[in-house]
A protein has these predicted regions:
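N-terminal intrinsically disordered, low-complexity segments enriched in P/E/S/T
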Residues: 2-6, 12-14, 22, 128-134, ...
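A low-complexity, Ser/Thr/Gly/Pro-enriched, surface-exposed linker/loop concept
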Residues: 11-32, 66, 70-97
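Solvent-exposed alpha-helices and their adjacent loops that cap or buttress functional pockets
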Residues: 29-33, 58-59, 99-101, 127
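Short, recurring structural edge motifs at helix starts
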Residues: 34-41, 54, 103-109, 123
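A generic structural signal for short beta-strands and their flanking turns/coil linkers
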Residues: 35-37, 61-67, 90-92, 105, ...
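Short, well-structured hydrophobic secondary-structure segments
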Residues: 38-79
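Short, structured patches in soluble enzyme cores that scaffold and shape functional sites
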Residues: 43, 71, 98, 111, ...
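Short, solvent-exposed interaction modules
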Residues: 49, 74-123
């Protein structure tokens, strides 16, 4: 089964994209320079808003999750895994982790990239507050 979820967001001048273990997309519109894992703000969805079918499929331990982050023609593809402990309860944030840590904000674990691994060309685009960013989450289980 393959389920696709699309989240629209935008850039912010304070995007750092330097965190080595996670990356985050948030519904918040403000961002301080301390938020080094945040790659997009003003998202249309948080973890709690994702489609029920997506959540159910992602809760399978053998689920493969692909996250594509696009800003115009520049994109980054991240491969991660699902986990039976994913709760998808956070109303504001979507967090992808390289580790196996799970909380209400976590939407995928075991990722092959974190914020610091994103191309600097993409990061430059993500620093533009007018830049539209499209996040596509695809789960296959």
């Amino acid at each position: 089964m393959r389920i696709v979820e699309v989240v629209d967001a935008r850039g912010h001048e304070n995007v750092q994209s330097t965190h080595r273990a996670t990356f985050e997309v948030t519904r918040e519109t403000r961002l301080t320079r301390r938020g080094d894992c945040v790659v997009a703000v003003g998202a249309m969805k948080g973890a709690a808003d994702l489609n029920l079918r997506f959540k159910e499929a992602a809760r399978k331990d053998n689920a493969r999750i692909t996250i594509t982050i696009e800003a115009d023609e520049v994109k980054e593809v991240v491969r991660a895994k699902g986990n039976s402990r994913l709760s998808f309860t956070h109303p504001m944030d979507l967090v992808v982790r390289r580790s196996g840590y799970v909380c209400g904000r976590t939407v995928a674990v075991g990722a092959d990239k974190a914020a610091s691994h994103f191309s600097r060309k993409l990061v430059e685009k993500m620093r533009d507050p007018c830049q539209k960013i499209k996040i596509t989450l695809t789960v296959e289980s």
